[in-house]
Amino acid sequence: MKAVSPVRPSGRKAPSGCGGGELALRCLAEHGHSLGGSAAAAAAAAAARCKAAEAAADEPALCLQCDMNDCYSRLRRLVPTIPPNKKVSKVEILPHVIDYILDLQLALETHPALLRQPPPPAPPHHPAGTCPAAPPRTPLTALNTDPAGAVNKQGDSILCR
């Protein structure tokens, strides 16, 4: 006789402290183990494997949630238009961030020092089919070598990694 337990709908978790036994029974049923007298050790081992598998499956989701919360708290600190003493939802943070980025872009485009600079010289015209030797480009991997490491303050690192 196989042990079968009701399966929770996907996307819903059991309340904390619940579901461990259900998970073990469901795991036993899925793996074809029986609950005979000699199967106690097999049941315990299967339950341990299933709990470890469930914990490993939840870890990436937990880490992603942790990273997202950390990013929102950084945005809350960095964007000056977000009221510091008021509880602001994640949905309310995003319009503040978008407005702040647009303000920064406008400030850069209208900055007097940038307006006074002469435009860069036009490239020389070359006959069709010929192309001058261009200077070698820096590979993107060299450009993306952890610039945040030099800028981040202590406590700004992503929590889960």
UniProtKB/Swiss-Prot annotation:
Signal sequence region: none
SMART domains (UniProt xref): HLH (SM00353)
Biased composition (Pro residues): 117-126
GO cellular component: cytoplasm; nucleus
Gene Ontology terms: biological process: negative regulation of transcription by RNA polymerase II; neuron differentiation
Region (Disordered): 116-161
Keywords assigned: Nucleus, Repressor, Transcription, Transcription regulation
GO MF annotation: an example: protein dimerization activity
Superkingdom per UniProt: Eukaryota
Record-annotated bHLH domain positions: 52-104
Subunit comment: Heterodimer with other HLH proteins.
Cellular localisation: Nucleus
Cross-referenced PROSITE patterns: BHLH
Name of the protein in question: DNA-binding protein inhibitor ID-4
Role this protein plays: Transcriptional regulator (lacking a basic DNA binding domain) which negatively regulates the basic helix-loop-helix (bHLH) transcription factors by forming heterodimers and inhibiting their DNA binding and transcriptional activity. Implicated in regulating a variety of cellular processes, including cellular growth, senescence, differentiation, apoptosis, angiogenesis, and neoplastic transformation.
Pfam families: HLH
